[in-house]
Every structure is written in structure tokens, then in C-alpha cells.
Amino acid sequence: MRDYTKQYINGEWVESNSNETIEVINPATEEVIGKVAKGNKADVDKAVEAADNVYLEFRHTSVKERQALLDKIVKEYENRKDDIVQAITDELGAPLSLSERVHYQMGLNHFVAARDALDNYEFEERRGDDLVVKEAIGVSGLITPWNFPTNQTSLKLAAAFAAGSPVVLKPSEETPFAAVILAEIFDKVGVPKGVFNLVNGDGAGVGNPLSEHPKVRMMSFTGSGPTGSKIMEKAAKDFKKVSLELGGKSPYIVLDDVDIKEAAKATTGKVVNNTGQVCTAGTRVLVPNKIKDAFLAELKEQFSQVRVGNPREDGTQVGPIISKKQFDQVQNYINKGIEEGAELFYGGPGKPEGLEKGYFARPTIFINVDNQMTIAQEEIFGPVMSVITYNDLDEAIQIANDTKYGLAGYVIGKDKETLHKVARSIEAGTVEINEAGRKPDLPFGGYKQSGLGREWGDYGIEEFLEVKSIAGYFK
């Protein structure tokens, strides 16, 4: 049982102002595996004050000093690899192999990318007799989601540290353990007091007062659209800068010259990875009518090989949904798809056979889906694929862009000219060609209702900077 009932404020583990705690549930067993403090406004005020007190000092550290700090974090993060992997498997239910290969590694990659970005990043630019300076924005509030406990947290922290901005972090109360380990890492390597502050709690007790605090200069949030909208509303009262990475309903366009087995394998992975709890999941698979039958046959074969089960057993590829609430939401969407006339091709409602305990869902494929159906328009956040057919490329692009979201898109095929045309035509912040993967130094963010701003690498650092013009500096 993990007992993390203290907050990390101003370089020390301190008692929370609140006597309340939040239980953390292992979604694979439905058992309580620990608890964290349920912080309140007083905790937030204390953390913001600590960050504000160190703001000017940290802002004026040199690039080399901040780079050295990030390098120390990278080394200690690597030392805590097993702790991080075990924590994520416990709190998220991710298979051990996924916790190591994806969750742990992505967190590490962001600290490395921010450190390396400082090699060439220009914080000052001369323009004739004038100077343009980029400097730390100040106290930044970070609110991170449960689906990627290290990735989403590390990318924000790494960028803020590289920029010279102190932070107050509120991680998800459903997966808080990884953030506590990060706090331990920062404490050990000597992150200056006040530069990093961790306040555990829920949205009402911590998220709201953090978003509204007058000394917080910017809010960086990853999560749902409705919550992002509320944060924007609260931040608008004193015109805070806001960076939002929100939901998605990403299209995966399969071209007619594709290797069908390769395409079926790729699209399967984009839906079942992390149990479908991925904002960039390619859950709308667009397939040419001319290869539909062959593709579906191979797709069913690929889905049949996916092993759902105990995340601590070798060979498990897909773990549970994060919570009972989220499990029920996924079931509701599956039932909605059936009600609206989509054809259930694989999987369906309920749990996989033999997995009565835990929030396990059946990987599911719907075919004959109309893009206006609920399952094609709303983010399900579970292992549910909608297959939509198209007759020509123009129709595929039209369907792909017929969504309120624009976080990611995918295309797979052989003809380079066609691949490039599709990639340029998809209205999304990130497009992958032939499973190229996203490198941590590329900008990440969304069009339309998928968010504001960009994260990762030097683009992520810029979210934590203000720009100042000094006229006549060189006269």
C-alpha cells in the first residue's frame, strides 16, 4: 500500500492543509493500492507563493545551468526506471512491457529533448540596433491526465525547467504515483526550492484554485475538452496564457495500394495501444471500397491475436480501462453504435471471457459506420474502431476532416505523391505517414477543438516564455 499523503512544496514534503485523502484503485484488480492527499486552496496558495518567491532567481539562471539541471534529472530518472514502470502498471493497469517501452521511455525522451533543445535555442535575437528577448513567463500551473502519467507530466515539466519557469503540478488523482516519483527525483538532484511544487487532489479542490490564482501566469492542461474550456474561462479572468492539449477522433486513411496485412496490423495497434486510452488514437479507419473485404478479413485476424489480460503476465498486450466510470462510458458507446445501426464486426459489449474482475473491455470493431454516427464523432477513449469506406481520395479527405477535432491523422500506402497529398490535406496538428512515429523534438498539438499551443521540444519551451522587444539596445 502506497501512502503519499504529503504535498511537495518549496523543496519539502509537508502535511496537506486538508485531512482528507483520495484512494487510488488498481483497475486490473479493483483493489485500493494507495492513497494521496486531497489538497485544497490553502495548499495551492502555499505552493504558488513558493514558486513566485523563486521566480526571478530561476528566470535569471543561465542556459547552461538549466541544461545541467535537466541532465541530472535524466540520469536520476534512469536510475528510477523500475519504480516508474511498477507504479504505472499498478495505477494505470498498463502491461509491464508497455509501461517500460512507452510510458517510462516517453517520459525520459522529453527530458532529453528539452535538454538537447537548449544546445541551439536562441533566447535573444539582435535586429539591427534592437534586441528581442525571450524570458520565462513566470509561475506556471500544470494539470495532467491519467492516461500517460509520465509522458504528459514530463513534457510540461521539462519545457518549463528549460525556459526557467517555476511550476505547480496537479497530476490526475487516478494516477498520481508517477508524479510523486518525479518529485523524489527532483528532490534528490537538487531542483531549487520552489521551482517544483506538487499538490495532489481533485479538480475542485486543486485544479480550480490553481487556474484562478492571480500569481499564476500560465496554465498548461492536458485532458478533456469540457475541462479545458472551464480552465480557459477561469484563466481569462486575469488573462493568463493557456496551453491546452485536448481530445481527438483521429482518422487513419488506408490507401488502395497498401500492403493489406501491414495496414491491418498498423490500424489495430493505433486502436488497442494503451487500451485505446490515447488522445491520438486512430479510431476512424477509412478504407477504399475496392479492398474492403480483404482488409476486414485481415483486420479480424489481427484483432483475434490481441491478448487482453493481467498486466503483470507475460504476453499481455492490453490491460484494463482506468476506472469503473470510464469502463461504463466505453460500454455506453458500444451500445450506442449498435443502436444507431453500425454493424458489430468484432468484440462488443461486456468483458472478455475469464476477466470478470477488473475493468477489462473487449477490443471492438464496427463496420458500415456513417461518419455522422456518435461513435465516429465522439471520443470514446477505449479500444473501439469504426471502419468507414470511401470511393475516392477526395471523399476520404472530406470524411477525415469532418470532425470537430484535429489532433492527429494517419495515412498508409505506397505512392509517395498520394501520401504527401493526404498528409498535407488532413486538418490536424500531427500527421504520420506509414507509421513513422512522432519524435520528441517535433511540435505536438491540435487544430480546432483539440487544443491551443504546442508542446514537445523547442516549441514546448516557447509556451513557457514571454517575448520582449528592447529598442535601441545596441545604439
Curated annotation (Swiss-Prot):
Gene3D superfamilies: Aldehyde Dehydrogenase, Chain A, domain 1, Aldehyde Dehydrogenase, Chain A, domain 2. One of its GO terms (biological process) is aldehyde metabolic process. PROSITE patterns: ALDEHYDE_DEHYDR_CYS, ALDEHYDE_DEHYDR_GLU. Its EC number is 1.2.1.3. NAD(+) binds at residues 146-147, 223-224, 246, 379. Keywords: NAD, Oxidoreductase. The keyword Oxidoreductase applies. It holds the Pfam family Aldedh. It catalyses: an aldehyde + NAD(+) + H2O = a carboxylate + NADH + 2 H(+). InterPro entries: Ald_DH/histidinol_DH, Ald_DH_C, Ald_DH_CS_CYS, Ald_DH_CS_GLU, Ald_DH_N, Aldehyde_DH_dom, Aldehyde_DH_NAD(P). The active site is at residues 245, 279. It is an enzyme of class 1 (oxidoreductase). It comes from the Bacteria. GO terms for molecular function: aldehyde dehydrogenase (NAD+) activity. Belongs to the aldehyde dehydrogenase family. This is Putative aldehyde dehydrogenase.
